[in-house]
Amino acid sequence: MEMICVLFLSLVPAYSRGQGVYAPAQAQIIHAGQACVVKEDNISERVYTIREGDTLVLQCLVTGHPRPQVRWTKTAGSASDKFQETSVLNETLRIEKIQRLQGGRYYCKAENGVGVPAIRSIRVDVQYLDEPVLTVHQTISDVRGSFYQEKTVFLRCTVNSNPPARFIWKRGAETLSHSQDNGVDIYEPLYTQGETKVLKLKNLRPQDYASYTCQVSVRNVCSIPDKSITFQLTNTTAPPALKLSVNETLVVNPGDNVTMQCSLTGGDPQPEVLWSHSPGPLPPNSLVQGGNLTIWRIRVEDSGYYNCTAINNVGNPAKKTVNLLVRSMKNATFQITPDVIKESETIQLGQDLKLSCHVDAVPQEKVVYSWYKNGKPARFSDRLLITRNDPELPPVTCSLEIIDLRFSDYGTYLCVATFQGAPIPDLSVEVNISSETVPPTISVPKGQSTITVREGSRAELQCEVRGKPKPPIIWSRVDKETPMPSGTMTVETYDGKLRLESVSRDMSGTYKCQTARYNGFNIRPREALVQLNVQFPPVVEPAFQDVRQGMGRSVTLRCTMLKGSPMKVATSVWRFNGTLLAQPPAEQQDYSELKVDSVSRETSGSYECSISNDVGVSACLFQVSAKAYSPEFYYDTPNPTLSQKQSKNYSYILQWTQKEPDAVDPILKYRLEVRQLAQRNTIQTFIPVQKMEKGLLLEHILPNLKVPQSYEVRLTPITSFGAGDMAARIIRYMEPINYPSPTDNTCRFEDEKICGFVQDKMDNFDWTRQNALTQNPKRTVNTGPPTDISGTPEGYYMFIEASRPRVTGDKARLISPLYNITAKYYCVSFYYHMYGKHIGSLNLLVRVRNKRAIDTQVWSLSGNRGNMWQQAHVPINPPGPFQIIFEGVRGTSYEGDIAIDDVTLKKGDCPRKPIGPNKAVALPGSGVSAQHGPCLCGPLTFFLYVLLR
């Protein structure tokens, strides 16, 4: 009777009782993966506790129609941990090897365009315990008029952890407690970063010289083991001390081989010596051997501070620093400064004049400047003064000042910078002083004040400088506080030209050129402005638009220019399926339009509008048709799987709505294509449509699907125009379990939810769901089933693996959902596979939930039972709500895999045929014997089922 009803429903499409199934998104976050929980009462939707290094798996379960899209975001993390928003179609967020900085609050945002988005959050708490750090500090104080000294030792133990760690101090094997005697004190210091506990040993006694251990624990949260560190305190314990073989400032020549020796002069236990460099790491041409640091063929860029540090966790680390300077000279510049007192900007006879010379050198203070006039050393006099370090100019700048300039002072002055006694080439700069030496002027050449170029081409901005000498030109942007294309804020040129390669629209704007105050006159800079205009092709919208309209109706297409340079439509060209359309000349405006008078099969297709602004062309693309939009599959169907008890087939309730049905002509029928995954054959049928409106839920039953196969379903609407857009989805088999009312339902483990069974968190390892296709090809031979009870490679079963790291006696427990009592007697039936010479035990337990949970073993089987599936029937009579537990126990070695399949919980008696190890066991508190007679539950259930139908 049931098969006839299912076949009848599969031929006629059904419709929902109401209209408008469009619903806003709803979301719920669940966590999977390697979660661990501190306490049972902390299990909630909003907190996910996980161990650092494990895999985080969050699932955002969504409902709503159309199917919502999911986006994950994160807050409350480190600034360095930027979590990017992504669209995850499978609603799953997975983070491998999660780190502590990735803890925080994660948000799932689901939206489908109906109502407001659904936003849910969950806090991820990453648990960790670092290795503790133990440091020792000693103080010595005079007591009673300096007759003797009192020595106090502080052992400081610090650790980073989450949750906060518990500290245990031990002296040898003895656990120390706070104030257990006058010589011991344990306290937590104020204003410490991380967690810290201090063990204070007052007025050190002989027995205090011992081995001390700091043990830290997070109480086995997430199975994180305790950690500890030990220190041996002796009467020779002392902090490290260092000495250097070189001065704290070391000046060397480029190309030298440099060795710096850092020697230990004290410390117990033996300190560790480390070398470091700032800024940056040690140079690649260096080698550290013990306390010696050697740098071969040293370069200028190897200059910096080299730090030698000795650490033994007693007292503060000892540190010595060497400031290593590699001699160098570069960038010789000069300045001509007219009479400052008279605020002059030109050279005039009778006024003062100052010539300045500067080089960038290391070390700067070791540079020696020499001045020459017309090739001869300048003679110093009352009118010719030399200042070695001019306070008005950059540090270590040498100035030659001429008082009361005369005609005889005209000539060529040469400034030479040297490192005396060092093999560094001299640098020199020449300054010519004459009546022709005049300050600079700057201007833009005629016709060059505005430069217009196309995007991607080369641009050249130019300013002309007149004067003697000609200073460099410094370019910068005026209208935007952005760097130049080179990445710097200014660019220096010597020919007055700023060359820009491959310009972009962002480079448009005003540029300033100004004279530098070096290699010329040290006066107020002269400035000029140049405007750069970058022309670029138009930006249009829409780039693509799907236009749907019923046959015979008109539609107007518009392509709008959003921006461009120049901002005007020069020409617009329309094409239909690549063929040029005649279009009247458009007026000067920022858009172009085309009207399609009547949509038909002949006028349906691709329309392209190309808009030009004489610089480039951009196009709008319109796809015009009377095709129907795609169906919208309904994913929130309750219990979509219908099982067929007489065969291992199932039916599936497929539901959908039609997107925008009124946008085009009425839908006449649907083409349905069903294909089993991994196969090519497709079954095609047509579903007629009797009624259609927006939001109406359509329904069709897919019959004779094979358990546990998955199928691809394609659904295409058909109108008088023809086939519309196709929608596809995957149909996956789900166990039709309506627990907690399990009567006559069989769990075949074909669905990932495994019928609500869960792994016990208190066992040693887990059961695994697998089939012949997913099992490990390297699995141990001579044990375990090749397939499930059905014999198909796709069929799933639950399995325990006995190979390493499992050891003898390890247990894996699989716990069912909680079942409410609706009958006096139940029968648990299941298939088991126990093949291998090292088989352990398979136990069935019943957990009764009354005032407290009580686990009772009701069935057990051990040893090799052959390479076959066998069935067991176990009667139970629980006195209250109960769960069943399958417990697999690992045997003596690796050939001991155990599997179970097809678990059924039925009301009433078990079959009366004898079952080897089966034995009825009365549960505590039941008050009845294990043997019982038949009951009328089966017929009564069938009668109620018929009434409900």
From Swiss-Prot:
Residues bearing glycans: N42, N90, N235, N247, N257, N292, N307, N331, N432, N577, N649, N820
MAM domain boundaries: 745-912
A GO BP entry: neuron migration
Keyword Signal (UniProt): yes
Residue stretches making up the Fibronectin type-III domain: 637-737
One matching Pfam family: MAM
Signal peptide boundaries: 1-18
Subcellular location: Cell membrane
SUPFAM superfamilies: Concanavalin A-like lectins/glucanases (SSF49899), Fibronectin type III (SSF49265), Immunoglobulin (SSF48726)
Disulfide bonds: C60-C108, C157-C214, C262-C308, C357-C415, C463-C513, C559-C609
Superkingdom field: Eukaryota
A GO CC annotation given for this chain: side of membrane
Lipidated positions per record (GPI-anchor amidated serine): S926
UniProt domain Ig-like: residue ranges: 24-125, 132-230, 240-323, 338-432, 440-531, 537-625
Tissue expression profile of the protein: In the embryonic brachial spinal cord, selectively expressed by medial lateral motor column neurons, some populations of dorsal root ganglion neurons, and interneurons.
Mode of membrane association: Lipid-anchor; GPI-anchor
Proregion positions: 927-949
Alphabetical keyword list: Cell membrane, Developmental protein, Differentiation, Disulfide bond, Glycoprotein, GPI-anchor, Immunoglobulin domain, Lipoprotein, Membrane, Neurogenesis, Repeat, Signal
General function of this protein: Required for radial migration of cortical neurons in the superficial layer of the neocortex.
Assembly and interaction partners: Interacts heterophilically through its MAM domain with proteins in axon-rich regions and through its Ig-like domains with proteins in differentiating muscle.
Name by which UniProt lists this protein: MAM domain-containing glycosylphosphatidylinositol anchor protein 1
Organism: Gallus gallus
Gene that specifies this protein: MDGA1
